[in-house]
A protein has these predicted regions:
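Active-site-adjacent beta->alpha loops and helix N-cap segments on the catalytic face
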Residues: 28-30, 76-86, 146, 189-208, ...
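Catalytic cores of alpha/beta
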Residues: 58-60, 228-237, 270, 276-294, ...
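Glycine-rich phosphate-binding active-site loops on the catalytic face of alpha/beta enzymes
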Residues: 65-80, 239-251, 290-308, 337-353
Length: 353
């Protein structure tokens, strides 16, 4: 990317910038490769922020299945983080994870959970995880909440064999006029479910997978306490990315935390931030960061700039930090300031990975 008017008098935010179109050989939006160059292994340049109300196991599973990465918050107990990592690593990279219940569960039980899945169904299974039927909200019409599922579920199942490719699965759903069907292994046990939308999306998006073909997940680490001890434990649990995170990343405590984490996890992919200057980027890289997180106060819900007077327009911050990171053979993530889809494209144009 280059600026048509180099050396602007003021720093720029996303609202100040437009991209000028030029000659392109890309015939379709589906021909655009969005795989990230930062070495993480994601195929989509989207990271779910390490916020308690945002990043959890379902978000991590779903986003990784589409090629992105979710970062678990730093304030979650370590044993819970371990269980979430284990859960995500056990999910199928293509098939969606259904809600399962036994035949003796009630309509009330099912209705309390059914909205946690976009496909709007519960798979009723026996003790051996073999599908017996499917329950949807429509099946509850005319029955009270205490009616057991075996009395109302649809037993007309068309199961999909494990290993079926997306196109074949879509054809099976279309032929049988179903929006969702269970996927079973050779022993008839439930592996997951396929949906029409899911099969279509899996032909467009590639999942973010680790070296063992499992979904990827990141975890945040604070700079206080014993970041090295926590980082070592997270790597042993299977975390693919460590994000050393604090609001003001250009400080000596961050640099010390980075150094000790790098010492105990020499091969880990480490992200650190947040900073908004080339100097901050350089010092984080020198301390051990592979990727630098850029942004102080650009978020739509963030009041950092208003309350403290600290920050920098995001487009200029990303551009400057990305240039410095590239000079050092590293990369940056643009953190915050995205209010419109265009802002993602502008962040990538500015140099974000």
């Amino acid at each position: 990317m280059r600026l048509l008017h180099p050396n602007p008098a003021h720093d720029l935010t996303y609202n100040d910038v437009f991209m000028v179109p030029s000659l392109s050989a890309v015939a379709s939006r589906l021909d655009v490769d969005l795989a990230t160059p930062d070495g993480i292994g994601t195929t989509l340049p989207v990271v779910v922020s390490n916020m308690t109300a945002v990043a959890g196991r379902r978000m991590a599973e779903t986003v990784a299945r589409r090629g992105g990465l979710a970062v678990l918050p730093q304030d979650i107990p370590l044993d819970v983080v371990g269980s979430v990592i284990e859960y995500v690593k056990q999910r199928h990279p293509i098939y969606e994870t259904p809600i399962t219940m036994s035949p003796s569960h009630t309509i009330g039980d099912a209705l309390g959970l059914i909205h946690k899945r976009a496909h709007g169904a519960v798979v009723v299974v026996d003790d051996g995880l073999r599908p017996l039927g499917v329950f949807t909200e429509h099946d509850a019409i005319g029955f009270d909440r205490f009616t057991q599922l075996h009395a109302v579920m649809s037993r007309e199942l068309v199961t999909v064999p494990d290993g079926t490719d997306a196109r074949t699965a879509f054809d099976l759903l279309s032929t049988n006029r179903r929006s969702m069907e269970p996927v079973v292994d050779g022993a008839g046990r439930l592996v997951g479910v396929v949906t029409r939308k899911g099969t279509l999306r899996s032909t467009t998006y590639r999942p973010a997978l680790d070296a063992d073909g499992r979904l990827m997940i990141g975890v945040a680490v604070g700079i206080n306490g014993d970041p090295d001890t926590k980082a070592k434990a997270l790597v042993e649990m299977g975390a693919d990315v460590l994000v050393i995170d604090t609001a003001h990343g250009h400080q000596t405590r961050m640099l010390r935390a980075l150094e000790v984490v790098r010492a105990v996890a020499p091969s880990a992919r480490i992200v650190a931030g947040n900073v908004v200057t080339a100097d901050g980027t350089r010092q984080l890289v020198d301390a051990g960061a592979d990727i630098v997180k850029v942004g102080v106060g650009p978020g739509a819900m963030c009041t950092t700039r208003m309350m403290t007077g600290v920050g920098r327009p995001q487009f200029t911050a990303v551009m400057e930090c990305a240039d410095e990171a590239a000079r050092l053979g590293k990369h940056v993530w643009a953190d915050g300031g995205v209010r419109w889809p265009r802002d993602v494209a502008l962040a990538l144009a500015a140099g974000a990975a």
